[in-house]
Structures are given as C-alpha cells and as structure tokens.
Amino acid sequence: VLDTETGNMMEYRHLIGNPRYKKDWGISFGNEIGRLAQGMPGRVKGTDTIHFIHKHQLPADRWKDVTYGRICCNYREQKEEKNRTRLTVGGDRINYTGDCGTPTADLLTVKLLLNSVISTPYVKFMDIDIKNFYLNTPMPRFEYFRLKLDNFPEDVILQYGLREKVSSDGYVYLEVRKGMYGLPQAGILAQELLEERLAKHGYTQSKHTPGLWKHKWRPICFSLVVDDFGVKYVGKEHADHLVAALKEDYEVETDWEGTKYCGITIDWDYKKREVHISMPGYVNKACIRFEHEKPTRKQDQPHQHTIPTYGAKIQFAKEADTSRPLDKEEKRYIQKVVGTFLYYGRAVDPTMLPALSAIASSQATPTEETMIKTKQFLDYAACHPDAIITYKASDMVLATHSDASYLSEPKARSRAGGAFLPIQRCT
C-alpha cells in the first residue's frame, strides 16, 4: 500500500504499526480471516477454507510440509471493499506432485477479444468477477501453514480462541481444506471444478487458445483470467444465461458496462465502433513509489539511441560496459522498476517495451550504466504517464510485421520488434 504522504510502500506489519492505518487494516485482515475460516459475526460469512488447530493435531507425516503464511495488502479503488487484504500460503514449500499448470487468457487474447467486440455488429462487452473463487474448491489432500499470534487483530484472537491454541514459540497453526491463494494446485483445481460445472450449461474451453471459452450454440464467448470473465455477447439474454449458470455455485459481481478488466480501464464507443484502453494513474503512483520526480526538461526518448559513425562503411559494436557494479539495494531497485512497468507496457504502452527489455537483459548483473538507462526510462514514463491505445473496427484479418535495429544492444546484439496488426484499419 502506498503512503501518499511519504511515498513509501507499506506492508501489513507497517500498516498495523501506524496509528493512522491500524484500525482500518486490522478490520480488513479480520474480514479476510473470517472469509477463509468460519466467518466474523455481523461482518463476513466463512468458507471453511482454513481451520485453526493445535500444534499436536498436525499429522505426524506432514511436519516437513508446514509452510508459512504471507499477508498481502492492496488498495483497490474499483472494489466495494477498497482496503483489500489477502492471506496467501507459501507455495514454494508445498510438496504437490500433481500438474499445477492452469490455462489462463494472456493479454494478447484479451486484446483480440476487445477488438472483436467493436469489429462485430450488435456485440456488447461485460465483465464478471467470481468472489472467493479458489476458496470454494475442496482439496483431497490438506495443507498446513503457521502464523505468529502477533499478526492477528484482537477480535479474531477472541473469536477463534487463539490464545488457547498458540504454541510455545508464539505460532498459530492452520489446516487448509480448500483451495487458497498461494497454493500451486489451487488454480488448476478451481478451474477443473468450474469446467465441470459450466459444461452442464454448454460452455467449454478452447482446445487451442488457453483461457478462451465458448458456448456450443449461443453467440457468447469469454476470456478467463483467474476469476475475472471478460464476456463478448450478442443479446442480453445470453449473458444472463452465463450469469445464472455461475450463480448456481458461486457468488458473482457483474459490470454490465465492461469498464474494467485485468486492471485495464476500458472506454467503449459502440457508435463509432472504437474502444480505448488505459491505466490512468498507474505511472504516477509508480513514480511516487520510486521517488522519481518529473524532469524539468521533457524526456521523449525511453532509451538511449546508438549514434552512428557517419561516413564509415562499417558500424562497429559499442565497447563493453566497464562501469561500477551496483550493490544489492540498487539491483533490487532496478528489478522492481522492470517488474512494475512491464505489465503496463504490455497492456497499454508498447513504446516502453524496448527500453524495459534492454534493462531487464542486464538486471542480473547491473552496473551504473544500467541505472542511467533506468533513470532515463523513468524520466520518459513521468513525462508520458497516461498512455491510451485505441482499437477501431477491422476485418480481424491479421498480418505480421517485424523490424530490427542493428548493433543497438550490448555485445553486438540487435533489437528486434514484432507486431500483429489488423490488415484493414489498424490501431
């Protein structure tokens, strides 16, 4: 969570240690425990996903499988409960031998679906969100994790009698009986159950495009990203059919305007047959997080350009980078910048991708030169904070276009770019 006063990013331990945030985020975590466990009276209903147990109740053959829990906080403006806390399980210590791969729609599939909506007459778009998607999936094999008693708000401690269950080393042990965030098997188990339930109503997932679902005869299809449905439909009665099918087994939220999906803001203009996608405010928040101010001189170039040697018949590669290696904190800073902006670049601002690719290629062993590239990139981002991509109706016939630059990367490498664009009217 971003502290707008200091620009620092705060985790749960920081939030409950700050008098300004302690009450609100304590309530948020209490609600999360209630959802996962057996509820919090008057606030949330439980899903029986987790059960608090005594340490001696752990099966003797599962001691080595006990993992940790992590409390993740996020502020979600578009959600009904804006202070969002999620308790996740340390999946890196789970010994699950089955297949954990979960088909999910990638950004290319999502963008093609949006393009298809405005390219097809009489089509509309909506999105559906399943609440507690993972938490409704029974698991044949239970998992176990532990948390410090100090992490729990007082009302949760009293509600579940945790002082009677805490171990001598201050930990509370939990048994996971249904799918939960962080478990490597949670995604595939939840999707297999969804597939079984929707098949009864005529919906199946594409064999060739992960995360794309269709009905066997209704004019409706949707992309699925974890628990978010982006639905393309002709005729509201067909969308109502999907919503009703989901409501048989899940609690769902619907947005009939289809204005938000995968963190992307969507502005539909069905009359002009255009759609505009953006992520307003994302870059500004990132710049505050990285304590990077907008430069006084506008930066219109996301990465350095390679100056050619004019008149030379042969262009030689740049000399090797011999600048100072970065320390651990500086290296982590580089990695955070790349991780933060990569999704934004892929989603709405592809002009950032060559620069991010160049920085990412050296983030394992970054140098002072890498930091200079990163600062220039942040200057560019700060000067161009709210990119918008507009898709116009097309015949949805795809052509391949590619291009490459010569000796523009270290070690005599070239930078290549590729794109798939509709042949008729492009973006």
Regions found by a protein language model. Give the residues of each.
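Long, low-complexity, charge-biased intrinsically disordered regions
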Residues: V1-T427
